[in-house]
């Protein structure tokens, strides 16, 4: 994944470990998640390569910053605008089937002149290449061999387990992003409460001092004492 322009502020790139490929051809596209800091008044774009005839799911959340909103757009490799959202806190979008090439994801914070945003997004691929590999593995074994359990049943069980495990990872990742956003909100509220509490205490002390000074003036006798 490549960022358009210079990577700004906090950037955390988490990828699954690469899978080794014995034969020729490009390695499979990996799912990934990315957290970055989007400055006020700026737009940040990313490019992600995708194979043909696959499924690409994009999920994003604004987990920090005033308003917790951002503009989002997604373009195909041909430059066709697939998704355009304005001032959203989160979103989930699926492209199926995908085109071979680089998809463009943009996050825009131009509407904000002061507040920067902490944005998390995740890319999830579901390629047909995995199914073809499983089919090739099944064809390498003769169906009339000693095993009584059908290879189709084994393949379906493994595939179901793989899908459930991948979905569990995705759900846990989203829950982690929600937790980070809620924590940022609570910390921001705590800072505001502490600030205004300190202001109120300072005002009360100032009023108390002024009242004491005013009362002292009332009881002061400034008339001259006769000799």
UniProtKB/Swiss-Prot annotation:
Q: What is this protein called?
A: Transmembrane emp24 domain-containing protein 1
Motif position, COPI vesicle coat-binding: 218-227
Residue positions of motif COPII vesicle coat-binding? 218-219
From the UniProt record, give one GO term of the biological process aspect. intracellular protein transport
Q: How does it sit in the membrane?
A: Single-pass type I membrane protein
Q: Which GO terms describe its cellular component?
A: COPII-coated ER to Golgi transport vesicle; endoplasmic reticulum; endoplasmic reticulum membrane; endoplasmic reticulum-Golgi intermediate compartment; endoplasmic reticulum-Golgi intermediate compartment membrane; Golgi apparatus; plasma membrane
Q: What functional role does this protein have? A: Potential role in vesicular protein trafficking, mainly in the early secretory pathway. May act as a cargo receptor at the lumenal side for incorporation of secretory cargo molecules into transport vesicles and may be involved in vesicle coat formation at the cytoplasmic side. Plays a positive role in IL-33-mediated IL-8 and IL-6 production by interacting with interleukin-33 receptor IL1RL1. Plays also a role in the modulation of innate immune signaling through the cGAS-STING pathway by interacting with RNF26.
Where in or outside the cell it occurs: the entry states: Cell membrane; Endoplasmic reticulum membrane; Golgi apparatus, cis-Golgi network membrane; Endoplasmic reticulum-Golgi intermediate compartment membrane
**Has UniProt tagged this entry with the keyword Membrane?**
yes
Q: Which residues lie on this side of the membrane: Extracellular?
A: 24-194
Give start and end of each GOLD domain: 43-125
**What gene name does this entry carry?**
TMED1
SUPFAM superfamilies assigned to the protein according to its UniProt record, in alphabetical order? Supernatant protein factor (SPF), C-terminal domain
Classification via SMART domains: EMP24_GP25L (SM01190)
